[in-house]
UniProtKB/Swiss-Prot annotation:
Keywords: Aminoacyl-tRNA synthetase, ATP-binding, Ligase, Mitochondrion, Nucleotide-binding, Protein biosynthesis, Transit peptide. CDD domains: AspRS_core, ScAspRS_mt_like_N. The keyword Secreted does not apply. Residues 216-219 are annotated as: Aspartate. Residues 1-30 form a transit peptide. It comes from Schizosaccharomyces pombe (strain 972 / ATCC 24843) (Fission yeast). One of its GO terms (molecular function) is nucleic acid binding. Its EC number is 6.1.1.12. SUPFAM superfamilies: Class II aaRS and biotin synthetases (SSF55681), Nucleic acid-binding proteins (SSF50249). ATP binds at residues 238-240, 502, 554-557. It holds the Pfam family tRNA_anti-codon. This is Aspartate--tRNA ligase, mitochondrial.
Length: 611
């Protein structure tokens, strides 16, 4: 019996002779001249103890792709070598009798050992830059040797857990008779938001495909095609600046449902899916329905549209408590009652410096400062304010630390200055043991709803942009505001957030072609050439498209969360660097000039110099 994977239960094989194939682990222990211990790792990352008691003749397996010269040289130097002399991470086949380890040496998952009688070297490992499980080399070396890193049981487990989660997703939607449809990866360039990856067309000179940022338009077309409820685990691409939680290509759980016009119909499906996945991965039963909060409440209380609601430290929007100012400016405040004197003035100032954006702070340590603290904050110094009234309404007292800033009423990003400071403050207070550490197994899911349909933009030729994408339907009560007050229109959009992480977002879509046309042309004021890129969608909506809505969940982030991985890089087989490079295979790479000519593409001198 030759095994490349150790059975889950080895007990029935005890006392029998077996052959096992795998990688020789670097760890070894010589206990005497004739006895040594080694370890073998199988394809699932499982480790088996090897006991070698005699000199074993090493058999070399001849492979057809190995030259005769190389083989002869290897054989002449290794015929009489023992197991100890084989380089770690070499692929071997060991044969021997399986035994239970002595009782005092048994540990869970390490209860058996193989008494080695024969060894075959299947492939020798040479010139390794790192070994599995070695985290000391820098990230670039780790990613350049990702194939070695993935052999480590931890990384092997991440990918296998991700695979099992994907199976649960497929099973969930199959049970509900959703239709899995694979939408094209060669799409067209449309102004949906993020920068796209483009692919030149050889057969259509001067024209390009674009890799999809999401299957958004295709899945809406499927709703008009009579498919009904659709899903897929979809590959998506965005050519944007990367962070630790972003990759240029990523995976999402994508779904769309026809004949729905209310967000709760989509939300119920998503909650059922997440309940199933969390139960499967962690054995935790989530309570339904999940909490709902409005976008405005999330911004005012947590300073973020993806709030971490596991802890308090609430913000307060005090604009209404102040004399009338610029209507486009909001004033927010965070009061921390430092009863244990855990935060020094220097630490408070350092937090403000870390955030920037005109955040200021003052501390109230004496009774006399209760009347004077407002004069220490530039935002309040010139205003006719009675400190006593603010103290009462904001529960400010002795040992209060007050952080404050002014910010735009309509946000360009999803986090306010004090929203950033709130997270840093909590992290610092936990580190100083002024607040308890968060339970790592606590999952606080929350729906954020009633987002603004449009947001300001910094582009000179466009005053507003879609907060999410231009296909989101306006809230029924706000349709009349589209023409005159678009920034006041709420969208039928919903984000699912857990522990401060945005897992996904969706919306009820515009299915009326007239409203879709009005949003694109009259509200967003797209120039004619950009509007033309959506004509196919207008035509589809005009053909009898039912009401519909959907959502996309980030599968990489979800897998990282449910496997307790530090980030998404761990649950992606071959992740890119922050510059978008795959260091293992060397992409992106230059293309021969003759191939560029086939695609009618020319590289400018400026581009060549930059590279």
């Amino acid at each position: 019996m030759v095994l490349s994977r150790l059975p889950a239960c080895l007990l029935p094989l005890v006392g029998t002779k077996v052959s096992i194939q795998g990688w020789l682990v670097a760890t070894s222990r010589q206990v005497s001249k004739s006895i040594s211990f080694h370890q073998l790792r199988d394809t699932h990352g499982t480790i088996l103890q090897l006991l070698s008691t005699d000199k074993i003749i090493l058999q070399q397996k001849r492979e057809p792709l190995v030259s005769s010269t190389d083989f002869s040289q290897q054989k002449s130097t290794s015929v009489m070598r023992t197991l100890s002399s084989i380089p770690p991470e070499s692929v071997v086949q060991v044969t021997g009798k399986l035994q239970r380890r002595p009782e005092h040496d048994r540990r869970p998952g390490n209860e058996f050992e193989l008494h080695v009688e024969d060894v075959k070297l299947l492939n020798v490992a040479k010139n390794l830059q790192l070994f599995p499980g070695d985290e000391k080399p820098g990230m670039r070396i780790q990613l350049a040797n990702r194939h070695i890193q993935l052999r480590a049981p931890k990384y092997n487990s991440y990918l296998r857990q991700r695979s099992r989660l994907a199976y649960q997703v497929h099973s969930f939607f199959n049970d509900r008779e959703f239709c899995e449809v694979e939408t094209p990866l060669l799409f067209k360039s449309t102004p949906e938001g993020a920068r796209e990856f483009v692919v030149p067309s050889r057969l259509n000179p001067g024209k390009f495909y674009a890799l999809p940022q999401s299957p958004q338009q295709y899945k809406q077309i499927l709703m008009a095609s009579g498919i009904g409820n659709y899903y897929q685990i979809a590959r998506c691409f965005r050519d944007e600046d990367l962070r630790f939680d972003r990759q240029p290509e990523f995976t999402q759980i994508d779904l769309e449902m026809s004949f729905v016009d209310k967000p709760h119909e989509i939300m119920e499906v998503v909650e059922d899916l997440l309940v199933r996945l969390v139960s499967f991965a962690k054995g935790i039963t989530l309570a339904k329905p999940f909490q709902h909060i409005t976008y405005q409440h999330a911004i005012d209380k947590y300073g973020s549209d993806k709030p971490d609601i596991r802890f308090e430290l609430p913000l307060k929007n005090i604009t209404s408590l102040l004399p009338k100012q610029d209507p486009l400016i909001s004033t927010e405040i965070l009061v921390y009652n430092d009863l244990s004197h855990s935060l020094s003035n220097a630490e408070s100032r350092k937090l403000c410096e870390a955030v920037g954006e005109n955040v200021v702070v003052t501390s109230i340590r004496e009774h006399s400062q209760l009347q004077t603290w407002v004069k220490k904050l530039p935002q309040l110094r010139q205003l006719p304010i009675v400190a006593e009234e603010l103290n009462q309404k904001l529960q400010i007292g002795i040992n209060s630390i007050v952080f404050m800033t002014n910010r735009p009423k309509y946000l360009v990003s999803g986090t306010t200055p004090l929203g950033k400071l709130r997270l840093l403050l909590h992290e610092l207070l936990v580190k100083k043991k002024a607040l308890p550490e968060l339970d790592k197994d606590l999952l606080k899911f929350v729906w954020v709803v009633d987002f603004p349909l449009f947001s300001p933009t910094e582009e000179k030729n466009q005053s507003i942009t879609s907060t999410h994408h231009p296909f989101t339907a306006p809230h029924w009560d706000d349709v009349h505001l589209l023409e005159k007050k678009p920034l006041s229109v709420r969208g039928l959009h919903y984000d699912i957030v857990v522990n401060g992480i945005e897992l996904g977002g969706g919306s009820i879509r515009i299915h009326n072609p007239d409203i879709q046309r009005f949003v694109l042309k009259d509200v967003l004021k797209l120039p004619e050439n950009r509007y033309a890129t959506f004509e196919h969608l207008i035509r589809v909506l005009s053909s009898g498209c039912p009401p519909h809505g959907g959502i996309a969940l980030g599968f990489d982030r979800l897998a990282a969360l449910l496997t307790n991985a530090p980030g998404i890089r761990e649950v992606i087989a071959f992740p890119k660097t922050s510059s978008g490079a795959d260091l293992l295979i060397g992409s992106p790479s230059a293309i021969p000039e003759e191939m560029l000519k086939d695609y009618n593409v020319a590289i400018t001198r400026q581009t060549q110099n930059r590279n």
